[in-house]
């Protein structure tokens, strides 16, 4: 699938400064956390939220078992709990079309899993250096089995830095 997201990574500085759109982020929280998640799960509880840092770099690497993960994580570790937004590294295919338009405004940025670039890794490093909260699903895709996860090289490199 051809999707014009590579150009968005060319200027890392703008990706750092744009961040989370002030208009779309509250609407996304309302739609996901207050409506969709409550309808789907009725009740949710975050255990030990005091363990989430409120400042400084945070790298979250949760397992990815369902599409709900990307909605549940900001509810469990995002703005309402930690006072911070989650910046997701997502696949290039996720950043296409209307969905990609919204994801970009919510602070997501793409990684081409077939040909990961140093630019993407550098942006992730820059976000962490800026004290932001970065989310990377270590499997790189939804895994619905009970097998041990295979970490992608980029996450390993990122965690080592």
Identify the meaning behind each predicted range.
Residues 28-36, 99-102:
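Hydrophobic alpha-helical segments of integral membrane proteins
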Residues 1-8:
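Soluble, non-transmembrane catalytic domains of enzymes that act on hydrophobic metabolites at membranes
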Residues 21-22, 39-161:
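Soluble catalytic domains of membrane acyltransferases
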Residues 17-31:
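Helix-enriched interaction subdomains in cytosolic or periplasmic regions
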Residues 8-15:
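Polybasic, low-complexity association/targeting segments
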């Amino acid at each position: 699938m051809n999707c014009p997201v590579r150009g968005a990574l060319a200027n890392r500085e703008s990706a750092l400064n744009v961040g989370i759109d002030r208009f779309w982020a509250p609407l996304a929280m309302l739609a996901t956390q207050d409506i969709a998640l409550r309808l789907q799960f009725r009740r949710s509880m975050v255990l030990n939220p005091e363990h989430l840092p409120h400042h400084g770099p945070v790298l979250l690497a949760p397992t990815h078992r369902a599409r709900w993960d990307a909605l549940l994580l900001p509810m469990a570790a995002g703005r309402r709990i930690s006072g911070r937004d989650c910046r997701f590294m997502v696949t290039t295919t996720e950043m296409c079309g209307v969905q990609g338009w919204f994801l970009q405004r919510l602070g997501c940025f793409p990684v081409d899993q077939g040909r990961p670039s140093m630019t993407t890794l550098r942006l992730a490093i820059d976000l962490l250096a800026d004290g932001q909260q970065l989310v990377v699903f270590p499997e790189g895709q939804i895994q619905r089995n009970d097998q041990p996860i295979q970490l992608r090289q980029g996450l390993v490199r990122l965690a080592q830095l």
